[in-house]
Amino acid sequence: PPAAAANLGPDAQARFINLKAWRAEVAREHNLPAYVIFHDATLAAIAERNPASLDDLQGISGMGAKKLEAYGAEVLRVCQQG
């Protein structure tokens, strides 16, 4: 796994992989590099926290208000699908 995800437990690893797949899709749709959506470290932090609400996403490094608004609901959906 990437360094960002090296310390994650098995459930968080699975969420991280799902989040990376989702990010790749979004990046393709918007014709952006993946890191512009979220860095690996941000995805790893999200995977570790396993957010259940938008409030849970606040305060994660790399998750600003704009990204929370743009991607928050999708990120929660991806985390819940595992």
PLM segments and residue spans:
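Accessory DNA-binding and partner-docking regions appended to nucleic-acid-acting proteins
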Residues: 1-82
